[in-house]
Amino acid sequence: MQTTNAFNDNFVKFILIPLGVGLASIGFAPEGLEYLLGLLLVLPFVFLAPSAGWLADRFPKNLIIRWSSWFQLAVLVLMSFGLWIGVSSEGNGGGVALPLVIFAFFLLAVQSALLSPAKMGVVKELLGSSRLGFANGLMEGTAILAILLGQIIGGIWFDKWGLQVGRGIWQAAFTPVLWILIGGVLSIFLSHAIEPTKAAGAEPFKKKIVMRHFVDLRIVRSDVAMWRSALGIAFFWGFGGFLQLLLIQIAQERKGSLAGMGVETAILWMPVVLGIVFGSLLASWICGRRNELGLVVVGGLLMSVATVLLAFLSSGISSYGLLAIAGCGGALFMVPLNAYLQDRAPESERGLVISASNLCNNLAGVFAVVAQMACKKSGMPAWIQFLVLGGLCAWVSLYLLRLLPKDFLRLVVLGVFRSIYRIRSVGHREIPSEGGVLLVANHLTYIDAFVLSASCPRPIRFLMFADCFENKWVGFGARLFDALPISSTRARDAIVSASEALKQGAVVCVFPEGQLSRTGGLSEIKRGYQMIAKKAGCPVIPAYMDGLWGSIWSFSE
């Protein structure tokens, strides 16, 4: 349902952009309609953010999705009527048709703004936390694919099957929008298939809700991690909005006229589509068991490198490859942040949090529209715009690397480990998604910590002798995995440290044998883990590793 909604909105947008350019070229419309449409698309998200968040918390989210689907169909009918007026009065530029069509487009943006918190918030209600990263990867991939396909198909339809077969400007826009009504009907059917959900129980509507933008933002800002996630997501949408307008500018410069502009824009967008789809699916696969925030750094680095190189390779086959890399990086950047924000938001305020995040996203979108328009009007070459955009991405990536060094290194280390060793885990879903958990595992090799970390859906903290921290490489790995230093002469302190970590909601692993196995079987089990579990009041889950005995990391030889 989200896919069809996104496709419909962007299909219409990229029908209206060349329509406006064509009308402006014959004096029946002002220039720069693409910037007006860009603003109209994001302004409802800004002004309606508190109301949309309240709506998603006050009523069952599946009902909000259903109502918005009917509203979208009604608006598409209104837009078709406006375009029909334009066809009927083509000789005088369409008369009142253009203002009516632009108003209908604005209503489509209103519909998307009211729908967004409900469609994002319903994911956790239907799937829970454990599959949130995976679901967000699929959702973001299909949604962005729909956005870009809508833009590509809309532009090609207007150009190839409209103008180039002899139809007038209005007729070239009217026919495809008429067909898109089918997508509106499909959205309604899909919305009725969503399972019923419960309302979060928000307060009754009050006038002050309409203008409480900064109150909702304060909810997000009260949690530093949640606020940084919202800013990161906003940066992605600002980056995407600027890049989109920059590619439209390049298409206009290459063609120099309306003819062929839609196709050229579609050609430039195609590698971005493929990159985002691949990146979203990759993020979904990597985050299948747990949300990997280290991907955010990887995505940011890919975005910055690709965008900087586009400044020097803005034409030819290599430029399309770089656009694909930028798209892939953008998906890897956004998917974990979206999943983290949804998971961290309190259930009773999830709609408000997502709505406040949308407010940030669209303020970034407004800034992107204004900034790119200023760059174009000032005559700034495209290559300099790419360079500035890439430099900004590089700065953000380095900042994220400072914030998330452990997540990034952990992702890289475990990624390399998984590529060398094939690991099959059974029963990992028995580990609770939150709260303290004590894992009790057998100890076969020096790499047991990596095996368990690669298998568990949650980060694990291991008990490790303090002397090990003094070794350069072992100490690095211990800090990377937030190991708890203990002393062999102060056993009581070790029990207290482990218990405190468990009370704080961590997953702690102990090897109760106290040493590596010398035979491949179990050694004597020490009782310290029982004292830890009793003191922390947490569940104990046994973990057994097999197939490692005989490796170079064991005492088999």
Give the predicted meaning of each segment.
Residues 1-16, 37-75, 100-159, 228, ...:
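Substrate-agnostic recognition of the 12-TM MFS/MFS-like secondary transporter fold
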Residues 15-26, 80-90, 147-180, 249, ...:
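Transmembrane alpha-helix termini and helix-breaking/packing motifs in multi-pass membrane transporters
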Residues 58-74, 285-302, 382:
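Cytoplasmic membrane-interface "Motif A"-like loop-to-helix N-cap segments
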Residues 70-94, 301-315:
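C-terminal ends and interior cores of transmembrane alpha-helices
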Residues 95-105, 109, 134-200, 270, ...:
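Hydrophobic alpha-helical transmembrane segments
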Residues 196-232:
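Juxtamembrane intracellular "pre-TM" segments in multi-pass secondary transporters
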Residues 419, 433-490, 496, 553:
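Catalytic core of membrane glycerolipid acyltransferases/transacylases, capturing the structured
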Residues 427, 503, 507, 518-557:
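A cross-family acyltransferase "interaction/gating" segment
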